[in-house]
């Protein structure tokens, strides 16, 4: 379980950090759930990068 320190009674910031850390852990576990060939792994990586680009383009 990730450990996050709450500073200056800022619970909102601590909760945001906790969610980010726990999401990274879940993604890592999901990635190692089963074996993917190198080409498939690269395709998945490109797909995720494309989603991130779309997300940040829409924010601007």
From Swiss-Prot:
Biological process per Gene Ontology, one example term: translation
Record's protein name: Small ribosomal subunit protein bS21
Annotated family: Belongs to the bacterial ribosomal protein bS21 family.
Gene behind this protein: rpsU
GO MF annotation terms: structural constituent of ribosome
UniProt keywords, alphabetically: Ribonucleoprotein, Ribosomal protein
Domain of life of the organism encoding this protein: Bacteria
One GO cellular component term noted in the UniProt record for this chain: ribonucleoprotein complex
């Amino acid at each position: 379980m990730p450990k996050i320190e709450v500073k200056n009674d800022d619970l909102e910031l601590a909760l945001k950090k906790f969610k980010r850390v726990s999401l990274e852990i879940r993604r890592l576990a999901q990635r190692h759930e089963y074996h993917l060939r190198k080409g498939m792994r690269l395709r998945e990586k490109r797909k995720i990068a494309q989603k991130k680009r779309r997300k940040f383009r829409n924010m601007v």
